UniProtKB/Swiss-Prot annotation:
PROSITE patterns for the chain: ZINC_FINGER_C2H2_1, ZINC_FINGER_C2H2_2
GO cellular component: nucleus
Originating organism: Mus musculus
Observed effect of gene inactivation: Male mice display postprandial and fasting hyperglycemia while female mice are normoglycemic but display higher plasma triglycerides.
Induction: By TGF-beta and GDNF. Expressed in a circadian manner in the liver with a high at ZT14-18 and a low at ZT2 (at protein level). Expressed in a circadian manner in the bone, kidney and skeletal muscle. Up-regulated in response to glucose.
Keywords, in A-Z order: Biological rhythms, DNA-binding, Metal-binding, Nucleus, Phosphoprotein, Repeat, Repressor, Transcription, Transcription regulation, Ubl conjugation, Zinc, Zinc-finger
Residues found modified as Phosphoserine: S183, S248
Protein name, entry field: Krueppel-like factor 10
One GO term (biological process): circadian rhythm
Length: 479
């Protein structure tokens, strides 16, 4: 390493002499192409007037290869175990070109050297016993690596004798922020894991999801945004209590639509997850699980996706709507055992105690029984029983007083009906057609015809009237 530094020093002194001798010589046309290169070297050497005095101080702490930190040979760079604590951004050699892309150039230097030049130079100057230096071992979650063939300039650090801190070195500041972010995520993840161990199986299962670096901004990384997936059964209400709530809790309410779950007759419902921090006096975990009868089929619970900036360290209450399970209704059966239609109204059943049994009139009791052997008929009145007994004995006390008529009857109503046949009296008249009848049973039979005629069409009524008209007899034809 010391020989290489001495060679660099001799080369720089030779360049200084060449620059001082060049103006003395005559200017030739072929020197115009190299004029820009010499001016760039002269400006670069003038900016580092004190480099020679501090060269030995930085020589022990810097690698000998001018390869970029992010070149394709970063795994083969020489280094020592003591250099693991110093960011690689501060270990590049002095006077390296400024940040450039493959299509850009530096204002103070010539065109940027190619990657192949870096590779060959590093292979030639690489010591055999050096250990490879890996930046990924120091900061595994640092900012994403820069694209290939991009050099990093640290000319502003060559004049400093101090090591980089988090204020002057942006790489170290980014690593500290990422370390704080990782420690916060591990602490939050540990709290959730401890809470999950105390909750019954399949109650709450948080899963860390990996955020994509290309879609997460730097502001989100500093804020420590976390994404958790809580699978909460919709048939349970889980109350998780891990630590007391902070003095100034931050409430976060998110409306998340659960994914479509193909269940029989149960449509997917949106689930509202709201963080409600409550003061917890004791470190108990209480789980409220409603008991379901074994006859009901188990309802398929839709997973609930909870998203928030961070999980509070207090009590977390998840309120999940209960699934509606449509159980088949048993058919309605009447007291007599007859099945009723589901659309038919339910019959009204009156209680048996409300029924009032009507009192039986003592006068309507069939207390009069015929004493004739083998008869046993009963009657309400004694007169009816007396008339019945006359049928057994053959007694007819009522006789017709019409002149020349000697008929006798067992009942008085029969005698009255017989007398009308002699007189021609028609006591019973029809109120609709004014027809008269001698017997009441004849009038009743006639009234039935009027009741049936109301239900018939008009043409049938006309036909019935025509049938009532007696046709005149046809005259006998001459022989």
């Amino acid at each position: 390493m010391l020989n290489f530094g001495a060679s660099l020093q001799q080369a720089s002194e030779g360049k200084m002499e060449l620059i001082s001798e060049k103006p003395r010589e005559g200017m030739h046309p072929w020197d115009k192409a190299e004029q820009s290169d010499f001016e760039a070297v002269e400006a670069l050497m003038s900016m580092s007037c004190d480099w020679k005095s501090h060269f030995k101080k930085y020589l022990e702490n810097r690698p000998v290869t001018p390869v970029s930190d992010t070149s394709e040979d970063d795994s083969l760079l020489p280094g020592t175990p003591d250099l693991q604590t110093v960011p690689a951004f501060c270990l590049t050699p002095p006077y390296s070109p400024s940040d450039f892309e493959p299509s850009q150039g530096s204002n103070l230097t010539a065109s940027a050297p190619s990657t192949g030049h870096f590779k060959s130079f590093s292979d030639a100057a690489k010591p055999p016993g050096a250990t490879p230096f890996k930046e990924e071992e120091k900061n595994p979650l640092a900012a994403p690596p820069l694209p290939k063939a991009q050099a990093t300039s640290v000319i502003r650090h060559t004049a400093d004798a101090q090591l980089c801190n988090h204020q002057s070195c942006p790489v170290k500041a980014a690593s500290i922020l990422n370390y704080q972010d990782n420690s916060f995520r591990r602490r939050t993840h540990g709290n959730v894991e401890a809470t999950r161990k105390n909750i019954p199986c399949a109650a709450v299962s948080p899963n860390r999801s990996k955020p994509e670096p290309s879609t997460v901004s730097d502001g989100d990384e500093k804020a420590g945004a976390a994404l958790y997936d809580f699978a909460v059964p919709s048939s349970e209400t889980v109350i998780c209590r891990s630590q007391p709530a902070p003095s100034s809790p931050v409430q976060k309410s998110v409306l998340v639509s659960s994914p479509t779950v193909s269940t029989g007759g149960v449509p997917p419902l949106p689930v509202i997850c709201q963080m409600v921090p409550l003061p917890a006096n004791n470190s108990l975990v209480s789980t409220v699980v409603p008991s379901t009868p074994p006859s009901q089929p188990p309802a398929v619970c839709s997973p609930v996706l909870f998203m928030g900036t961070q999980v509070p360290e207090g009590t977390v209450v998840f309120v999940v709507p209960q699934p509606v399970v449509q159980s088949p209704r048993p058919p309605v059966v009447s007291p007599s055992g007859t099945r009723l239609s589901p659309i038919a109204p339910a019959p009204g059943f009156s209680p048996s105690a409300a029924r009032v049994t009507p009192q039986i009139d003592s006068s309507r009791v069939r207390s009069h029984i015929c004493s004739h052997p083998g008869c046993g008929k009963t009657y309400f009145k004694s007169s009816h029983l007396k008339a019945h007994v006359r049928t057994h004995t053959g007694e007819k006390p009522f006789s017709c007083s019409w002149k020349g008529c000697e008929r006798r009857f067992a009942r008085s109503d029969e005698l009255s009906r017989h007398r009308r046949t002699h007189t021609g009296e028609k006591k019973f008249a029809c109120p609709m057609c004014d027809r008269r009848f001698m017997r009441s049973d004849h009038l009743t039979k006639h009234a039935r015809r009027h009741l049936s005629a109301k239900k018939l069409p008009n043409w049938q009524m006309e036909v019935s009237k025509l049938n009532d008209i007696a046709l005149p007899p046809t005259p006998a034809s001459a022989q």
